[in-house]
Amino acid sequence: MATKKKTNFDDITKKYGAERDKALADALALIEKDFGKGSLMRLGEAANQKVSVVSSGSLALDIALGAGGYPKGRIVEIYGPESSGKTTVALHAVAAVQKEGGIAAFIDAENALDPEYAKALGVNIDELLLSQPDYGEQGLQIAEKLITSGAVDLVVIDSVAALVPKAEIDGEIGDSSVGLQARMMSQAMRKLAGHINKTKTTAIFINQLREKVGVMFGSPETTPGGRALKFYASVRLDVRGSTKIEEGSGDNKTQIGKITKIKVVKNKVAPPFKVALVDIMFGEGISSTGELLNIAVEEGIIKKSGAWFAYNDEKIGQGAEKAKNYLKEHQDVFDEIDHKVRAAHGLLDDSEVAETEEETTASKTKAKAKKEEKXVETEEIELELQD
């Protein structure tokens, strides 16, 4: 009886595996040729790439965002009640981008931007690109052209609620315009999302709040413009004013600002639901000294005992306002604490981390040398006493 030849599956796997690998390599080369480098990659290669960000202009918010700022090439939505600080938060991002040498644009659909206030927040108004469109489609088309140019780092649209479709503007008051704005925003998101990702532009959409009628359970709050923006946004921030900041006492109390809570309700680049508490001072914006003081106390870098604040065992003020004034007047101390806070939260780049490690090593070496010197002095004293 003839013996049946045993099939070697390893040889078959190797043969077809080699053919498959060659076919895949050819397909990848063709895709790269037709659509450009990076149009298709292995997930492992993409995972190793660190998310590029632009600073929000607020240390507390950069920490809450997890990645260290707003992600480049993504859409961000900032929403909240009236006068909660939404535009202030966006303008700080504009100032931060300009500080790094970037170009920012502001689509002012509400026609409410105050140049003097923007200047007080650190915005270079001479370099800021500003548009006040007549209708919604025009504003979105201007934003699209700026984004596709690849020359702009940040585009702010203020606000989605004010992007009124042309058909609604041309019509009469009282005409039905159900779904017009939602359709406009849905189409805009489909067009803009790809361009934003390709050019690595950060797009910030400021939005207002509305209330749904007849909601019995859950929050009745919603944002205008349909659902498209909610889906396409990588980051969504809920901005709400909470506590008054006052100075003086009794009848002479004056409100000089407010503590604002910024909640990260959606985040595709880091864990969501983190909260940043910032001091928004009237005429000044987010207080950098205020948020640094709060975070440094949380991290134990600045010690708080009762109403007193101390750094390196030296008292810097009784009460938060005096401690903030001390940090304003002593820039070197502010920079030192800021560096320590950023190091604690991994917000330093590689060169700064290396510099910090060198400083730490030098500090430890110095402390060790001092300890050894003290020990030698002690031994000499003991020998003298014995003699």
Swiss-Prot record:
Q: Which SMART domains match?
A: AAA
Segments carrying the region annotation (Disordered) are 348-387
Q: What ranges does the record list as Acidic residues composition bias?
A: 349-360, 378-387
Annotated binding of ATP, by residue: G80, P81, E82, S83, S84, G85, K86, T87
- Please list the GO terms describing molecular function: ATP binding; ATP hydrolysis activity; ATP-dependent DNA damage sensor activity; damaged DNA binding; single-stranded DNA binding
Function description: Can catalyze the hydrolysis of ATP in the presence of single-stranded DNA, the ATP-dependent uptake of single-stranded DNA by duplex DNA, and the ATP-dependent hybridization of homologous single-stranded DNAs. It interacts with LexA causing its activation and leading to its autocatalytic cleavage.
By sequence similarity, the record places it as follows: Belongs to the RecA family.
- What is the protein's name according to its record? Protein RecA
Q: Which gene encodes it?
A: recA
